[in-house]
C-alpha cells in the first residue's frame, strides 16, 4: 500500500487565447491539496482522493481493472469548463477551491492479497478524515466500491475527533445514500466490493448507532432473495431501478427528501454500475437496465442542496472495458455536478 502525491500533469485541457478570462477550465484551477493549516488559509473547499484499488472487486468475483480509473476520471474532469455561476460566486477565489490529494494504491500484484484492501481503506480513510477536519469536502475516486467502507471510516474518525463529547449518543445521525444496482450488504469471510454497507451496519451497531441507508437504483436481477431479506432486517430504504423509471419524479424526490430529513449528515456514494451499460460500458459489473443519467444528476443535486453531504465518492469505473472514454466522461460529469452543487450551496 502507498500514497502518491497528485500528478498535476494529468490536469490538462484546451487553451483559449482568443477568449475572455471567463473561458476557464477545471485544469486551470486545481492545486495540490495541502494537508496542513494552509488548506484552510487558502480556502480549499474540495479535496479529491483517489482509491486505486480493485482488490475488493477481485474478492467479489468481479472483473478487475477499476484501480486504473482515478487518474483517468481526473483527466476527463480537468477538461470541463467552470460554469458562470461559480465564476461569479467565487471571483478572486477560484484558484484555491479545488485540491488534488493524490491516490492511495493497493499493491496486490493483480492477485488475491491478504490485508492489502483493509490497509488501503484505513489509509484512504485517514486522508478523508483530514480533509473533513480541515473544513473541506472529500470526494473519493475509485477504484472498486470497497472505497465505501473507507469513506465511512474517514467520516467516522472525523466525527469522533471533532465531537467534544465522548458520548456516542451526541454524534450526528449519519445517513448513507448509495446509487447502485447492488445493495452491497453481502456476507463474506473477507471484505469485498460487495460487503461495505454490511460492514458499516455492523460498525454502527457495535457503537450503538442506527444504520440509515438508502439505496437508489437497486435491481431485482442483481441481488438475491437473501440480500433483500438482509436489507429488510437492516431497515434499508430501497428505491428500485424500475421505480426510478416508472414513478413520477415528485414521488421519488419526496422519498429521498424524507430520508434526508431523518438524518443530520450524509455520505453520498455513486456506483457507476447504476447506469445502463449503453451509457457506461466501462464498469466492473455492467447493468442491463440501469437508471437514467438525467435522473441521477437530478437526484444528486437534490441531495447536495440539503447542505448535509460531508463526504462523497464515485466508484467502479473500469477503463479496461470503456469505449472512447465514455464511462470516464460520465463519471467526470457527475463529479462536476457534485462539486458545483456543493460550492454553490456554501
UniProtKB/Swiss-Prot annotation:
Mn(2+) 1 binds at residues 145, 180, 184, 271. PROSITE patterns: ARGINASE_2. SUPFAM superfamilies: Arginase/deacetylase (SSF52768). GO terms for biological process: L-histidine catabolic process to glutamate and formamide; L-histidine catabolic process to glutamate and formate; putrescine biosynthetic process from arginine, via agmatine. InterPro entries: HutG (IPR005923), Ureohydrolase (IPR006035), Ureohydrolase_dom_sf (IPR023696). Its EC number is 3.5.3.8. Keywords: Histidine metabolism, Hydrolase, Manganese, Metal-binding. Binds 2 manganese ions per subunit. Gene3D superfamilies: Ureohydrolase domain. Mn(2+) 2 binds at residues 180, 182, 271, 273. CDD domains: Formimidoylglutamase. GO terms for molecular function: agmatinase activity; formimidoylglutamase activity; manganese ion binding. It catalyses: N-formimidoyl-L-glutamate + H2O = formamide + L-glutamate. Pathway: Amino-acid degradation; L-histidine degradation into L-glutamate; L-glutamate from N-formimidoyl-L-glutamate (hydrolase route): step 1/1. It is an enzyme of class 3 (hydrolase). Disulfide bonds: none annotated. It comes from the Bacteria. Its cofactor is Mn(2+). Pfam families: Arginase (PF00491). NCBIfam families: hutG. Catalyzes the conversion of N-formimidoyl-L-glutamate to L-glutamate and formamide. PANTHER family: ARGINASE/AGMATINASE (PTHR11358), FORMIMIDOYLGLUTAMASE (PTHR11358:SF35). Belongs to the arginase family. This is Formimidoylglutamase. The gene is hutG.
